């Protein structure tokens, strides 16, 4: 995980990721490959990735609407990546992430990591409303 130095999720531990280069017509897979290379220096291909979730998030941080594509990367790393301008890295076990001992975004604790734990070998489509009270609805499980 990366301890983010910038918004969104500043000062929280989060999976690596980023935004699609929409003006270039970048696909979610191309974005995941690029962000992995940029953030941790790992060269991967589409075959290293498994898309396990698509989440539509309404009112994230009270204002914006996000469409997230969550991937599990089958290619593993042995050592921590070098620190980057966006933050520093650490390895954590799933139980440690969910324990509350490390600071992660509430939406990650409530949704993202539970989805990873239950559906990382399949596919789930989910809609979340991050308004005053976080609500979510699974729309499809494959």
Residue ranges and their predicted role:
Residues 81-115, 136-141:
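NUDIX/MutT-family hydrolases
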């Amino acid at each position: 995980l990366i301890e983010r130095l910038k918004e969104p999720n500043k000062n929280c531990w989060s999976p690596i990721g980023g935004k699609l280069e929409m003006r270039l017509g970048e696909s979610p897979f191309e974005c995941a490959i690029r962000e992995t290379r940029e953030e941790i220096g790992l060269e991967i291909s589409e075959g290293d990735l498994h898309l396990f979730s698509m989440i539509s998030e309404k009112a994230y941080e009270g204002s914006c609407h996000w469409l997230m594509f969550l991937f599990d990367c089958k290619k593993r790393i042995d050592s921590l990546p070098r620190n980057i301008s966006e933050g520093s890295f650490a390895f954590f076990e799933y139980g440690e992430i969910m324990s509350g001992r490390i600071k992660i975004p509430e939406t990650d604790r409530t949704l993202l990591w539970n989805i990873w734990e239950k559906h990382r070998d399949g596919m789930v489509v989910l809609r979340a409303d991050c308004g005053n009270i976080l609500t979510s609805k699974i729309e499809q499980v494959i």
